[in-house]
Curated annotation (Swiss-Prot):
Sorted UniProt keywords: Cytoplasm, Transferase
Pfam families on file: GST_C_3 (PF14497), GST_N (PF02798)
Protein name per the record: Glutathione S-transferase 3
Zinc-finger listed as a keyword: no
Length: 229
């Protein structure tokens, strides 16, 4: 029996959360090693297993993979979530690129000042509802299927659901003008593996709190202020 993937990151969302989502949607159990001290991080650095001296890092199939996109590409391909041919893969990459951009606006959110959080929240909601959600609403309308690409679940669907839920944490009715996305959210959330991941007690991480921010700053020695996009 193959060993479970091992995820090295902080006990919070950050860049690892999309990896957790993808593994969970594929029905893959995984283990996690949480970075909690500077000494622990330096030990990893000294071991040489962090190719570019940064996390996320995932041990899978005898490899120690870094770079979030490379990790996600591998998982999507391994578990048949990356389309049936090159054309579908290109569409998946394009749609994931869009949701990546949207979620990127939220990645730094926990590290912002209270004043900047208010500004960034309004910025994210505006971008989501004026640029990104209309685009995916149109994709669903034009494609006419239950999924964004082809007629089966792909990484693009999983990533979009993750992005939708993140935006709804900032504005609960963000999907009010997008009926196809509302139906999409309900449909994808009902897939058994995803439903399990969304249920209490899963390895899905909550909204990052002050403890998470403090840990990341301490481990990475982040002594600078983070500014909104």
């Amino acid at each position: 029996m193959a060993a479970k993937p091992v995820l090295y990151y902080f006990n919070g969302r950050g860049k690892m959360e999309s990896i957790r989502w993808l593994l969970a949607a594929a029905g893959v159990e995984f283990e996690e090693v949480f970075l909690e001290t500077r000494e622990q991080y330096e030990k990893l650095l000294q071991s040489g297993i962090l190719m570019f001296q940064q996390v996320p890092m995932v041990e899978i199939d005898g490899m120690k993979l870094v770079q979030t996109r490379a990790i996600l590409n591998y998982i999507a391909g391994k578990y048949n979530l990356y389309g049936k041919d090159l054309k579908e893969r290109a569409l998946i990459d394009m749609y994931v690129g869009g949701t990546d951009d949207l979620m990127g606006f939220l990645l730094s959110f926990p590290f912002l000042s209270a004043e900047d959080k208010v500004k960034q929240c309004a910025f994210v909601v505006e971008k989501a509802t004026s640029r990104y959600f209309p685009a995916y609403e149109k994709v669903l309308k034009d494609h006419g299927q239950d999924f964004l690409v082809g007629n089966r679940l792909s990484w693009a669907d999983i990533h979009l659901l993750e992005a939708i839920l993140m935006v709804e944490e900032k504005k609960s009715d963000a999907l009010s003008g997008f009926p196809l996305l509302q139906a999409f959210k309900k449909r994808i959330s009902s897939i058994p593996t995803i439903k399990k991941f969304l249920a209490p007690g899963s390895k899905r991480k909550p909204i990052s709190d002050d403890k998470y921010v403090e840990t990341v700053r301490r481990v990475l020695r982040m002594y600078y202020d983070v500014k909104p996009h």
